[in-house]
Amino acid sequence: FEITNSTFGVVEGISGVGKTTLLNLIAGLKKPMSGEIILNNKILSNDYEFVLPENRNIGYVFQDFALFPHINVKKNILFASKNKNSDFYLKVIKKLNLESHLQKMPHELSGGLMQRVAICRALLMEPSLLILDEPFSNLDYENSINVQSILKEYISENKIPCLIVSHNTNLFNEFSELMRIELR
């Protein structure tokens, strides 16, 4: 399949069918047994050494958030940020309602807050591809709608593709540039 800029690709399928494995292959966390993975005309699947997603300029929000447990929220967010003092940084933190949580440690956060921190970190990387594995699973309805709005705006403004695994695919019905990928 091919996903173009400013498009949301929603990967659907029953549990255990390989949705997360597909994301890990694209992100470079697993090596494909066959085929090619191409991002911005570069064949990523030819990289035989393990390459972290951020080194491929891929923003990846994992199911389990992958926050660093021994540093605070602000340092977690800034870990891969390209513009640590920019207006963009402040705008994203404010939109995700994280201002009052910057000095907290990850273990002090709810699942929904950890999810928003992980999404914030991925956006501040300014990636050429955004991969989100169950980005709404720990969010209440209001925060899900807020994050959805932020993602739509970010993807549209930055003209990058976004690949999402989500069991709540109804959230994407109003997206204008939507591609559904069903794994069986």
Task: State where each predicted segment sits.
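Catalytic Walker B motif of ABC-type/P-loop ATPase nucleotide-binding domains
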Residues: 130-134
